[in-house]
């Protein structure tokens, strides 16, 4: 008989880089999860914007099981049908001409930055290596991507960091313009800063970055790891803004919970990559590709994308009602189903405490820094689940302002 598993086992056995909740989920269906004790939670965290179709979606299970009964992996010495079908779906749905598959958002961003450096070196010379990113950004945890992310708390322990990366103020075109010049090979930006507080870019900011990149022969990289695959009510957020990047990274929701990432590129950009310039053992795995292909089939429809915008209104209307009662938030912001509630000055730094109260009340939410409570639910979350979950969130807010649950 196997040994019972408890939350304490995490503290005994795992590298202490996370501080997970005190309960362990064991089963999910749609936007509901149940823990080891049978307690139900409405899931508005979505695995950090990953579970775009909720838990255990029947068509995703079917796609996974069908491929699992055939073969699981061959390595990049061979291609496979699911990955080629997935590549064609992404190309047909976006600006891209070529796709590189990997396993995560960090890997996709790493590939994008490497491609941008090689593109600049091949076309203009090795002096053109500068990367401009933005303060409070998040692009992953590899040494290259954590350096591009503009949050020193994540990178300061790992010096020396890769050179030639500079950070401008987000949504400040003058700040970016002061850093972008003819030595810049790429600008990497999130259309909405997710980990940085759910801060949407302005249209003028992204349009201005496109113009600056064109002027200085730099590639514009959109990190759509969190905003992509329907999250904003468009398949990718660049469509919402009407600004087309040269490279786009996608992951998280692309696999609906199965690990997969991708770099989308124009033909011109992709042409500098040749056999051996980059690679990954698991990228384009047929299991991941089969699931991701079904995710795209289900999400890239007018009904689903219009529904995301409708669900945004459900959330914002109810969150504003809750805020009117308890006065916790200075702003409710975001696009589609990436929503941030910004704590007012009286409650600054206490987002984590609110998320903990929410879990006690039976609803899972995220934070984005110390001052923002973040919602990233499934794109198909039902109106009943939204109502029930936000009823529970209201209970959590009441407990928080009254000093916490007993």
Swiss-Prot record:
The modification N6-(pyridoxal phosphate)lysine is found at residue 252. The keyword Lipoprotein does not apply. Keywords: Aminotransferase, Arginine metabolism, Pyridoxal phosphate, Transferase. Pathway: Amino-acid degradation; L-arginine degradation via AST pathway; L-glutamate and succinate from L-arginine: step 3/5. Its cofactor is pyridoxal 5'-phosphate. The keyword Flavoprotein does not apply. CDD domains: OAT_like. Its EC number is 2.6.1.81. GO terms for biological process: alpha-amino acid biosynthetic process; arginine catabolic process to glutamate; arginine catabolic process to succinate; ornithine catabolic process. It comes from the Bacteria. Pfam families: Aminotran_3 (PF00202). GO terms for molecular function: identical protein binding; pyridoxal phosphate binding; succinylornithine transaminase activity. It is an enzyme of class 2 (transferase). Belongs to the class-III pyridoxal-phosphate-dependent aminotransferase family. AstC subfamily. This is Succinylornithine transaminase. The gene is astC.
């Amino acid at each position: 008989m196997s040994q019972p598993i408890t939350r304490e086992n995490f503290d005994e056995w795992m590298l202490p880089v996370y501080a997970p909740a005190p309960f362990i989920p064991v089963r999910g269906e749609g936007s509901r999860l149940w823990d080891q004790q049978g307690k139900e939670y409405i899931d508005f965290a979505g695995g950090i914007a990953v579970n775009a179709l909720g838990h255990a979606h029947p068509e995703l299970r079917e796609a996974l099981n069908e491929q699992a009964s055939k073969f699981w992996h061959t390595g990049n010495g061979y291609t496979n049908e699911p990955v080629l079908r997935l590549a064609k779906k992404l190309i047909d749905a976006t600006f891209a001409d070529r796709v590189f598959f990997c396993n995560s958002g960090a890997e996709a961003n790493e590939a994008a930055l490497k491609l941008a450096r090689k593109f600049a070196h091949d076309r203009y010379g090795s002096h053109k290596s500068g990367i401009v990113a933005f303060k409070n950004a998040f692009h992953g945890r590899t040494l290259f991507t954590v350096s591009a992310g503009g949050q020193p708390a994540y990178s300061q322990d790992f010096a020396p960091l890769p050179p030639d990366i500079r950070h401008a103020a987000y949504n400040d075109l003058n700040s970016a313009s002061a850093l972008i010049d003819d030595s810049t090979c790429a600008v990497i930006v999130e259309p909405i800063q997710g980990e940085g507080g759910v801060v949407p870019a302005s249209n003028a900011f992204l349009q201005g970055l496109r113009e600056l990149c064109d002027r200085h022969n730099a590639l514009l990289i959109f990190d759509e790891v969190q905003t992509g695959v329907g999250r904003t009510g468009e398949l990718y957020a660049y469509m919402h803004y009407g600004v087309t990047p040269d490279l786009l990274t996608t992951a998280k929701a692309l696999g609906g919970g199965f690990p997969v990432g991708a770099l989308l590129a124009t033909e011109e950009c992709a042409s500098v990559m040749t056999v051996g310039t980059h690679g990954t053992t698991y990228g384009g795995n047929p299991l991941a590709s089969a699931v991701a292909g079904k995710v795209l089939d289900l999400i890239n429809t007018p009904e689903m994308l219009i529904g995301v915008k409708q669900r945004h209104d459900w959330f914002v209307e109810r969150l504003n009602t809750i805020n009117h009662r308890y006065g916790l938030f200075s702003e409710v912001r975001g696009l589609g189903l990436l929503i941030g509630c910004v704590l007012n000055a009286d409650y600054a730094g206490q987002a984590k405490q609110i998320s903990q109260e929410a879990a006690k009340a039976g609803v899972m939410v995220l934070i984005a820094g110390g001052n923002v409570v973040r919602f990233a639910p499934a794109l198909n979350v039902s109106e009943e689940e939204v109502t029930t979950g936000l009823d529970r969130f209201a209970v959590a807010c009441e407990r928080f302002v009254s000093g916490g649950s007993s």
